[in-house]
Curated annotation (Swiss-Prot):
Coiled coil: none annotated. This is Holo-[acyl-carrier-protein] synthase. Homodimer. GO terms for biological process: fatty acid biosynthetic process. It comes from Escherichia coli O157:H7.
Length: 126
């Protein structure tokens, strides 16, 4: 196994809150997968939930070396928790095609949040 990419992102939670206040659900619709959207709609801390997903997806896009462009979209990266509660990534569409092209065999996700910030790191391996 070799490390193919590493990405880190930090999000100011108040910034996400301000965008939601201005534009309603538009940001959530753009960032979240369908499964994440269903969770977000009833989540007890929707702003924090969205901020953490945003951080992971930005970190993943950086790990892939592309950013969000050329057909990649935030909602093609889905954050879920395994049976132990560990954050994991599931890919869809162009993100999945890119992972296959690069030979990605494993993705590691770490996620942390405090009162004002959410931070994520993603490592992709062959």
């Amino acid at each position: 196994m070799a490390i193919l990419g590493l990405g880190t992102d930090i999000v100011e939670i108040a910034r996400i809150e301000a965008v939601i206040a201005r534009s309603g659900e538009r940001l959530a619709r753009r960032v979240l997968s369908d499964n994440e959207w269903e969770i977000w709609k009833t989540h007890h801390q929707p702003v924090r939930f969205l901020a953490k997903r945003f951080a992971v997806k930005e970190a993943a896009a950086k790990a892939f070396g592309t950013g969000i462009r050329n057909g990649l979209a935030f909602n093609q990266f889905e954050v879920f928790n395994d049976e132990l509660g560990k954050p994991r990534l599931r890919l869809w569409g162009e993100a999945l095609k890119l992972a296959e092209k690069l030979g990605v065999a494993n993705m590691h996700v770490t996620l942390a949040d405090e009162r004002h910030y959410a931070c994520a790191t993603v490592i992709i391996e062959s």
